[in-house]
Amino acid sequence: MIEQDPYRIADPDGLETPAMVVFEEMVDHNIAALCDMVGGAANLMVHVKTHKSEAIARKQLAVGIAGFKCATLRELEMALEAGAPEAILAYPMVQRRKVERFADISATYDDRKVYAAVGDPRHVDVLAQIAQNRSQKLAVMVDLDVGMHRTGAGLDEEATALYSAIHAAPSLICGGLHVYDGHEHFRDPSARNAAAQRHVDDLKTLKGLNEITEDEKSI
């Protein structure tokens, strides 16, 4: 049990607000507990929107967490600035200026794995066009809708058509699949595992999604 009583802000009036103030030992404890829950830090791709803090991202990196999910381009930059070797912008982009900025970030960190989620042919089109104009290759992940109904292609011909569109674009590389099952709130691990397995089984029925090119293997 971590005691909270010893924590006091020595000079409250000297603290400029708003500011994020945390119990550092609790943050460290929670990061370690999360790694234990999933069998090791290497099995995690953590979402930075819960803290939006480069300092906490560095703590996560220090224990071996390598993958980071981001909701905004600024979060993506933050994770990469902290040293993340792999990061995905989990919300698809359609605005050209955002895609241009994503391309800039990808070019700056071309020694990392930086992905954009795509869930619709329009996302593929704008990314492919801008990447081609810049003579640049951009990495993407196919965003799949497994029941949240917020973003992503359906687990049917939508997904296979999207996957085919990516392969048809010379300036894009498909780095894998992205799924968010936020509609499921099972507390029981066995129920969570069963739901996840159903999604895996559904994916196996989609022809073409398991055909990985040599470029994709090396991304």
Model-inferred region functions:
Residues 2-7, 26-56:
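N-terminal glycine-rich anion-binding loops that anchor highly charged ligand groups
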Residues 37-42, 168-173, 205-218:
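A structural motif corresponding to the C-terminal end of an alpha-helix
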